[in-house]
UniProtKB/Swiss-Prot annotation:
Disulfide bonds join 56-64, 92-100, 128-136, 164-172, 200-208, 236-244, 272-280. The gene is hcpC. This is Putative beta-lactamase HcpC. It is found in: Secreted. Transmembrane segments: none annotated. One of its GO terms (biological process) is response to antibiotic.
């Protein structure tokens, strides 16, 4: 009898320890986010929401952000842009950079909140200050386009420089184009080429295409067909029609490479399919069907 009581008491202690351990685990916000991410990957969005809610209540910024994503996408909950904005705001207050950026997007487009360009700029600026490249690029784009603020190429250069420094490929390409044209900064072809090259390294196809053009024509560097071919080839691999067309043209004309009409035609075909009109035109001249 006494032995049975001891066993029962031991079981209660063990169960108590398990419960305590569970509570402790639930109180670890980062672990909660990890569990939420696991549930999300398994497409159990309802369970993911529960974990993210608990993490957010414990002021874990990524928990609030992920909760905002669920409401924005309508996963595990009814789609609610107002709630998405609310949770992005909480994440941003807790210095989660992408939360600031996406909140900026909502204010810029007026989704879930009243459209407010000044607030969009404020949140993009905070994202950029938190070293989120897309936040810097968004600011650069706004000042570059001049649709909702007075166009300011100097500020565009400032923010695209920050974006490029944070390895945003598109930001590097646009920065290169500003150096190329001398907008907001003195014209500097060497800096333009360096920016395009970095963009290409970051797998931005227009950056590869533009770098290829500069090497091909000797702008910002000594004319170098080998480097031009390499950039056009990478642009083509990244589905840039102009890159495929220019690569094909160099192969067809034997520039920097042994003439290879067969390979050139294949690249013209790919370029045409990707929307490069010049590639389509040359195929017509050669009487070759795409």
């Amino acid at each position: 009898m006494l032995e049975n009581v001891k066993k029962s008491f031991f079981r209660v202690l063990c169960l108590g320890a398990l419960c305590l351990g569970g509570l402790m685990a639930e109180q670890d916000p980062k672990e909660l986010v990890g569990l939420g991410a696991k549930s999300y990957k398994e497409k159990d969005f309802t369970q993911a929401k529960k974990y993210f809610e608990k993490a957010c209540d414990l002021k874990e910024n990524s928990g609030c952000f992920n909760l905002g994503v669920l409401y924005y996408q309508g996963q595990g909950v009814e789609k609610n842009l107002k709630k998405a904005a609310s949770f992005y705001a909480k994440a941003c207050d807790l210095n989660y950079s992408n939360g600031c950026h996406l909140l900026g997007n909502l204010y810029y487009s007026g989704q879930g909140v009243s459209q407010n360009t000044n607030k969009a700029l404020q949140y993009y600026s905070k994202a950029c200050d938190l070293k989120y490249a897309e936040g810097c690029a968004s600011l650069g784009g706004i000042y570059h386009d001049g649709k909702v603020v007075t166009r300011d190429f100097k500020k565009a250069v400032e923010y695209f420089t920050k974006a490029c420094d944070l390895n945003d490929g598109d930001g590097c390409t646009i920065l290169g184009s500003l150096y190329d044209a001398g907008r907001g900064t003195p014209k500097d072809l060497k800096k333009a080429l360096a920016s395009y090259d970095k963009a290409c390294d970051l797998k931005d196809s227009p950056g590869c295409f533009n770098a290829g053009n500069m090497y091909h024509h000797g702008e910002g560097a000594t004319k170098n067909f080998k480097e031009a071919l390499a950039r056009y080839s990478k642009a083509c691999e990244l589905e840039n029609g102009g890159g495929c067309f220019n690569l094909g043209a160099m192969q067809y004309n034997g520039e920097g490479v042994t003439r290879n009409e067969k390979q050139a035609i294949e690249n013209f075909k790919k370029g045409c399919k990707l929307g490069a009109k010049g590639a389509c035109d040359i195929l017509k001249q050669l009487k070759i069907k795409v």
